[in-house]
């Protein structure tokens, strides 16, 4: 009898708690709108994270979701001439292929339109701004994101976001921490509107050296620590070597490490070729990733796919895949299937093969 009474009391207490919770949720929804709070379950599932390809199949695989996540802040950093802007322009081109509106905030005043066009960027549809101050640049970014009509905003670069106080001051004046404070405020303002609008914001950043570091890496990025915390993905891009055709250097071997990833396991590393005037070499990746996935076989210096030999030496195999786009698409689809990614779009691939 006592057990039954205790059971009834627990039921009543649970019912009271549920009633109080329902009342609190109703009050929140009245005050802040429907959908401002919900249960993370089957009835109100959070949509899967939408991704935009980076233009590099290997990097898409390393990121775990097939590309860079929409509705998030991304940081791409590395030394000079490492391929930061090239990689970002490939992301812009891929987003435009999906019908998205892209904006490029060129704080460095260094964007080469012809190079962007070679990488597949539609210049007629690309919004570009060359702001005078860091405050102006970040205000433009905030307005574009809040509009809900822009899919991707690129800021090139954080180091060039000079605060107004520094521009108006004399050369040599010390403005301690002004850029870090500016970035910290911008991150706080941008985060909520980026999530609501599902707009991806990519910040390109440069590397600086910390003075007096005895242990650990002396490298750091500009603009303080706020961007490091707010970024969902941080990519460290480096030049790993040169690609030569006889004595002429035709491109760079590039290494990218995913140093932070909130949407998949981090610390994955990938290498791909960036060819001068062409961008990321897709056929080179197909050969390297094909060998790892067991799709392409390498015997000595010969490469083969199925029963067909596709070339002696890596450069000859790359040329064979350029000349046979159907085979390249078949290899790509098998690589994607082995990693659980969606199949590539044939039309986009033809365009890339032609560029390579």
Curated annotation (Swiss-Prot):
DNA repair is among the record's keywords:
yes
Gene Ontology CC entries for this record: cytosol
One matching Pfam family: RecA
GO terms (molecular function) for this protein are: ATP binding; ATP hydrolysis activity; ATP-dependent DNA damage sensor activity; damaged DNA binding; single-stranded DNA binding
Q: Which UniProt keywords apply?
A: ATP-binding, Cytoplasm, DNA damage, DNA recombination, DNA repair, DNA-binding, Nucleotide-binding, SOS response
Q: Where in the cell is it found?
A: Cytoplasm
Quick one: a GO biological-process term for this protein? DNA repair
Where is ATP annotated to bind?
Answer: 78-85
Family, as annotated: Belongs to the RecA family.
- Quote the NCBIfam families the UniProt record gives: tigrfam_recA
List, alphabetically, the HAMAP family matched: RecA
Role description: Can catalyze the hydrolysis of ATP in the presence of single-stranded DNA, the ATP-dependent uptake of single-stranded DNA by duplex DNA, and the ATP-dependent hybridization of homologous single-stranded DNAs. It interacts with LexA causing its activation and leading to its autocatalytic cleavage.
Question: What is the name attached to this protein's record?
Answer: Protein RecA
Species: Paracoccus denitrificans
Q: Which lineage?
A: Bacteria, Pseudomonadati, Pseudomonadota, Alphaproteobacteria, Rhodobacterales
